[in-house]
C-alpha cells in the first residue's frame, strides 16, 4: 500500500533520477520557530500529512495540457531539518532537505511552485538544487513570506537566479513571468490584507483624521496642481465618516499593522528596533504629565547645565502612578530602551558628537558655517550670484521680497575685497530659506512658533572655511502680504548684548534649516520621492529582469518606514508636527516645494552645479570642479557617486548594447511610463524626464535612483543625532521673537543670556521628544545591508555582473581609506571643525547602533 502511494506521488518513472536540494526558511516569529520545525519535521514521513510541497518547472520541456508552459515535476516535500544557520536571537534560519524526481527530458528547472498547507506563514529564503545532471547547481533566491495556500488566488512561484530580458526569457517561462506581474499589480480594488503582495498607488489622503474634528483635517497631497506629490502605496482602507475623500486611519496601538506588501515589511530585528520607536511616539500623549520629572521651572531648561544633564548625569524619573503604569504596560527591556534607564530610573541620552569634545565649540561662527558643508543638511547652501539677493516670489501677491542686506553690512569682513570682487572670485555664498517660508510664515506664527524667514550670507576664506557675514530675518508685513516684509539685518559680534543677539540670530537660522532639513532634504527628497520607484519596479519589472535585480536592494524597508511615518510621524498631531516649527503646515509646504522637484537634478553633479557650488569641468575627475574645495559632503559624495555610476554602467552595458534593445524591452518601457504618468504623475508633463530610449539614459536614471536611496539619504539622516541630538545646536522651534530694546525680554537677555536663549528655542518637553526621535532615526539596525553588499552572494548567475559588483565593493573600500586620510589632514579644516567631529556620514560601512557613519543600500529608517 505504502509502495503504491509512493509510486503514485513520484510518478513511477523507471528512468527518473533524484536531485537533492536544500531549502532555507524561517518562521514568522523566531520565538516559536522550534514549534514549526518540529511540526514540519516530526511528521515529514507521514505521506498524507505533509505540509509544504515544491514542484519544479522545466524551462525546456513543455506541457501540452498547460498551454505549452513549462512542465511541472512531481511534488516533493520537506525532509528532516539539516541545521540551524543563525542564533535564535538574530532570526533563526533552518535548512531542510528536499528530493526531486528528475529525468533528461525535464532539463534545467527555471522556476518552482511552492504550496504551504501549514496553518501559518514562514519566510522562504532560498532553494538550492545541488547537482542537476548536465547543469550543475541551480539556485533560487526567494526572500519571501509564504502564507497558507488558501490565502492566495494563484500559485506562489519563484524563479532561478538567471536574469533574462523579456525577449530572452525561455518560451516556457514567459507566461509564468507575465502572470506573476499581474498578481503583484492587483486590480486596484478592495482593502489589502496582511498576506497580500499587491503594489499599487494612492495619494496622501490619510494624514489627517477629520472624524476627530476640524483641527485634525489635513490637506490631501497629490492629484492636484496646487498640491502635487509623489504617490504612496495603496492600502484600500475605507474612507472616513465625515469626508469620503479622506482615508480612515488605524488606531495608534496597531500602527505596525499598517499595510505594505508582505515582503516589504521589516524583518524580525528591524521590527523589534522600530517597536521601541513606536512606543516612544506614544509618550507624546503623556508629555503634559511629565513636567514632574524636572526640578526648576516647569517645561524650561534654566541653563545649559540643565541641558547637559540629559547626557551626563541623567534625570531622575518619579516613582509615581504614571511611571508605574508605563512600566506595567511595557516589557522591561523596552522600557529600558524607551526611557534610557540604567535600572535606577534615570533618563539619559548618549552624548551627541557635537558636544563630545567641547561643550561650547558649537556656538562659534566657524562651526555654524561648517555645518552647512558637513552637518546634517549640507545640501542647501548655494553660491551668491546677485547682490542684494532677490526673491522669486510673485510681487503681485507678496510685494517686494528682495533682501535689505547692503554692502555696508558686509564689506568690512571681505578681506579687503568689494562685494563685486568677492562675487566674481566665487567667495560669497548664501543659505537662503526666505522664499520657502514667507508664504506660510504668517500662519506658522499663529501657532506656538514665533520665527522668521532667514537669509545668511557667508564668505569663503583663504583657509577654505566659511565665515558668516550677515543674517537677515524677515516677517510678513503687518499690513498684509502685498506690502512685502519687514526685515532686520544682524552682523557678527562677540561683545555684550550684541553678542547675545547674534547668537539668537544664528539660532533662528538653525530653526529654519532644521525644519527645511526634516521636511525637504530628508522626508520629501529621499523618502517620498523614492516610494513610486519601489512600487513601479515591483509592478512592471519581473524579478527575472536585470534592472529589477539591480535596483531591488535599494528599496528594502522603504515602503514600511514610509507607511509607519504616515501613521505616527508626519500625520496630524504626530511627532513631526509636535517637534518642528512648521507645525500643521509642514507637509503642505513640502507639496509646494515638490513643484520644483526635477529628477535629473537629483544627480549629485547636477545638484552641485545648480546650486552654483561647482562648475562643469571635463578635466576634473568627476566632471565638475568644486568652488569650495573643502566641502566634505560634496568631496566624499562625488567619490561615492562615481563609484555607483561605474558599477551601474558596467552592469547595464552587459545587458544593453544598443538603443534598439532599450526600446524593445516592453517591461522597461512600461516601468518608465508608469513612473512618469502615475508614480510621479503630477509631474508627468515635465520636459526634463529622460525618454528612456538609450542605454545612457538608463544608466543615468538608475545611478540617480541608487544615489537618492543610499548615499543622499545617509548624508541627511544619520547625522541627525550627532548634530541635532543637542537641541541648542539645531533647535527645531523658536517660541518668541528677537527681544527689542526696552522690553523685559531684552533686559533678561543682558542679564542672563543663556536663559534667554533657552527660553527662545525648543521647550524642555519638546526637546525630550525631539531628541528621542532623532536618536532612533540615527541608529543602524544590526541587520542593515550597506552599499556594496547584497543579502545573498548568489543574487545573479551572470558572472560578469558579479565581477563588476566585486569591483564596486573594492572601490568603496578604497573610498573609506580616502575618507580616513582626508579626516586626518589638518589643512582640511571643514572635515572636523571646532567641535572635532570628523565627517564620516558618507563612510560606506558601519556596525549597528549610533555611529554617525555607514551608507545603507536603501531608505530604511
UniProtKB/Swiss-Prot annotation:
Binds 1 Fe cation per subunit. Iron is tightly bound. GO terms for biological process: fatty acid biosynthetic process; lipid oxidation; oxylipin biosynthetic process. Residues 163-861 form the Lipoxygenase domain. InterPro entries: LipOase, LipOase_C, LipOase_C_sf, LipOase_CS, LipOase_Fe_BS, LipOase_plant, Lipoxy_PLAT/LH2, Lipoxygenase_dom_3. It is found in: Cytoplasm. It is an enzyme of class 1 (oxidoreductase). Expressed in tubers and roots. Not detected in leaves, flowers, stems, shoot tips, or axillary buds. One of its GO terms (molecular function) is oxidoreductase activity, acting on single donors with incorporation of molecular oxygen, incorporation of two atoms of oxygen. Keywords: Cytoplasm, Dioxygenase, Fatty acid biosynthesis, Fatty acid metabolism, Iron, Lipid biosynthesis, Lipid metabolism, Metal-binding, Oxidoreductase, Oxylipin biosynthesis. Its EC number is 1.13.11.58. Pathway: Lipid metabolism; oxylipin biosynthesis. GO terms for cellular component: cytoplasm. Pfam families: Lipoxygenase (PF00305), PLAT (PF01477). Fe cation binds at residues 522, 527, 713, 717, 861. It catalyses: (9Z,12Z)-octadecadienoate + O2 = (9S)-hydroperoxy-(10E,12Z)-octadecadienoate. The keyword NADP does not apply. Its cofactor is Fe cation. Residues 33-160 form the PLAT domain. Residues 220-247 are annotated as: Disordered. Belongs to the lipoxygenase family. Monomer. Plant lipoxygenases may be involved in a number of diverse aspects of plant physiology including growth and development, pest resistance, and senescence or responses to wounding. Catalyzes the hydroperoxidation of lipids containing a cis,cis-1,4-pentadiene structure. This is Probable linoleate 9S-lipoxygenase 3.
